[in-house]
């Protein structure tokens, strides 16, 4: 209802689950009209539509061979991300030709063996292709993917990091740094300043 009250014609989403819920369930049920009051658009698709405006900002070469860990369920997202990556100077996009199933990693939770096989085969294909970088699309996937970075000869990032790099922007992936530690005490020690700044209970943080 809040989206509809803005009278906007387009609402952006990042998460494919949200995209499916809003565009296929919530928005169509809001009124009796054939058309929902607004269109839901995945952010990558929105950004690719504005590539002509973005391109002049991509000034720093990113000399990397990049493969994409992607899922086809959110229409147009993979194609949009490839277009965006291909616009980055110096970046070489590498197609791993992997099976395309689901809409993100969590959508394969009911098929754990297929999920693990897809992940393992993607990592091996990326290694065989001698990529420098495996880029994911969704943050939910990144939480799983980044934990494997130390086991492979390539970095694991979100595709937006590569766009930011070409724009001269960088922000450390603290989640990945902590995830790779694989040690609760080390994570607590490294994040002590943030725990204190946000008035968190260290034991609550440990449990989470």
Name the predicted role of every residue range.
Residues 1-208:
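Iron-sulfur cluster-binding electron-transfer modules in prokaryotic oxidoreductases
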């Amino acid at each position: 209802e809040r989206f509809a009250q803005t009278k906007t014609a387009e609402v952006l989403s990042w998460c494919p689950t949200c995209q499916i819920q809003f565009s296929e369930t919530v928005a169509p049920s809001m009124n009796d009209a054939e058309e929902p009051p607004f269109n839901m658009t995945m952010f990558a698709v929105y950004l690719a539509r504005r590539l002509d405006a973005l391109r002049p900002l991509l000034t720093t070469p990113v000399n990397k061979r990049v493969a994409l860990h992607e899922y086809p369920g959110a229409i147009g997202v993979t194609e949009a991300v490839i277009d965006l990556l291909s616009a980055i100077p110096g970046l070489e996009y590498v197609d791993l030709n992997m099976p395309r199933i689901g809409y993100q990693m969590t959508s394969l939770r009911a098929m754990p063996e297929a999920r693990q096989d897809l992940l393992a085969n993607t990592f091996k294909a990326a290694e065989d292709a001698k990529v420098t970088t495996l880029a994911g699309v969704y943050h939910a996937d990144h939480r799983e993917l980044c934990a494997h970075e130390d086991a492979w000869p390539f970095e694991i990032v979100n595709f937006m990091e590569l766009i930011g790099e070409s724009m001269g922007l960088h922000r450390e992936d603290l989640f990945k740094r902590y995830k790779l530690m694989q040690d609760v005490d080390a994570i607590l020690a490294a994040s002590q300043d943030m725990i204190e700044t946000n008035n968190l209970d260290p034991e609550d943080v440990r449990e989470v």
